[in-house]
Amino acid sequence: MGKVIVKIKLTNQGDLVTFNRKLSKTKPRTVEVDAMVAPEATLLYLKPSVIKKLGLERTDTVRSKTTNGDALRFKYASVRLELMGRAEEFSVIEVPEDVPNLLGQVPLEVLDFVVDARGQKLIGNPAHGGEQMTEEY
């Protein structure tokens, strides 16, 4: 399967909450970036340059299994991720600048997208008629 690249919109969730509660008149920091769809990865992984533009606060350190072995990675405060008309809040794991932004399995599951390997694109889950749906069983 070839690489599937998507354009994602990211908004600093803390900024968004503060703005929506009218505690700040400053618009939330937002960026649009390309991300590689990576179902073999777990979470949402962003480059340091993207994290800096969003002004995200470091919250923790996590262990991560990578193609180069185990690594310690920084975890950051949440972003609102928007993709193809769907949106949800996700925490962020930092990857080195030379690694692409990665959209892993958890965001794909929550947003209910799957990779169409034949078409080399991301699509709404056909098991749910292409519409976003949660499963509770």
List the predicted regions and their residue ranges.
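Pepsin/retropepsin-fold aspartyl endopeptidases
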Residues: M1-Y137
